[in-house]
Amino acid sequence: MKSHHSHQHSHPVTSLNSIFIICIILNLSFVVVEAGIGFIYHSLGLLSDAGHNLSDVFSLLLSLFAFRIARHRSNRHFTYGYKKSTILVSLTNAIILLIAVGGILIESIYKLRNPEQISGEAISWTAGTGIIVNGITAWLLMKKQKHDLNVRGAFLHMAMDTLVSVGVVISGLIIIYTGFTLIDTFISLLIALIILLSTWRLLKESMCLSLDAVPSSIHINEIEKMISNIPGIQSWHHLHIWAISTTENAATVHIVLEDIRQMENIKQQLRHKMHEMNIQHITIECEACPYICNEPHCC
């Protein structure tokens, strides 16, 4: 007799998809305007910010794609479905941002050697519009970013972009009142530094999740203590915790029971407590004591 247990879980992502679409439209429209004005007035600050905003649009598109493909049902080949695509997209987004930083640095060095005349008024007005666009986008993502690495990355990008636009406005005003056009290049270097700092955590966490490290939202010491404190569990071993996606986690553990007749009750307790600790997919292997093994937590 065949037995099949599906691990497919339905999560409402329609509202998040709509938010991503609105953010993409807003930012893509602004990129076209900002890049056009940057070319006309030879502003590296505007061009570098437009390039970064374009990478944000691409990142938002990738995130939207990942959320949609993650909804596909599991199959015989992808038994967890395509949920891990959200982690891969998060890692891709971090790499794209690092490439953008490299491009800004190269262009900044060129502009330092070959300075050009820049219109402070055009820079200020365009970047001022950017504050509004990026601010609205960050606000739309703010409520959704607490429990999802992809959304948090997008939110941080937009929040940083808002600050960057503030910096570009300041450089435009300095050019208007002092004529010091090199400030535009210095602002570009500052933009690159801000992007690098905001990307580092995203890159680090994405790489860790890609390598099946314990997610940062999971406190493994608390889980180990919780397992040890459940009555009827004499010892445990082979505890493994990893991320299935940027929002779902899984765990497997072997527990050694004092009384095998209490197996179902203990498994139910352990499963419930792990759910409370943000682990959604749990596999528990039960063994009767005495059980001989060399793991540190065994009896």
Predicted regions and their residues:
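Alpha-helical transmembrane segments and adjacent TM-loop junctions that form the membrane-embedded core
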Residues: 2-21, 41, 45-47, 51, ...
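First transmembrane helix
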Residues: 20-37, 133
